[in-house]
Amino acid sequence: DINNDGLIDFMASDMAGSNHYRDKVSMGSMSGPNSEAWFLNFPNPPQYMRNSLYLNTGTERFMEIANLVGLAATDWTWTVKFGDLDNDGFEDVYFTNGMSRDFVNGDLKDRFRIITNSDEKILKESDLWENEEPYRLSNMVYKNLGDFKFKNVSSDWRLDYYGVSTGSALGDLD
């Protein structure tokens, strides 16, 4: 309940870059023989690689507001947890991020495609991925300021662990 109206709101996470560089390299190829542009043209219903925050309107419908409140792009997110982390009466939002490898990086995929399609056939694509470093990202936490405003306070609250996190648990210990 992000707005304290007594109605349950919910969020679904996905992979949207939190900065311009990450956003662009994760888009995939838009042209060429190995293009991933089909993904944009043919899905039904369309799928968007970003978080979705659904606000309960108290009717039969929810309103999707992740872009409106600044929570749509939190990198390669696995877990979303709502909780009043600073005891101010508002539900804050915590995201865990990271991946074993950067599988959505279009630049890497294109480079690997060139290498694996070459005449030399030195390495398989799986070998190339194995040699890549894990895709380490910082976890993020956003303070709920009320009135549908959120502020990234990850480093202030020291919850910006840099690595690969695929889950989390939240509990009130006292």
Regions found by a protein language model. Give the residues of each.
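Acidic, glycine/proline-rich Ca2+-coordinating loop motifs
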Residues: 1-174
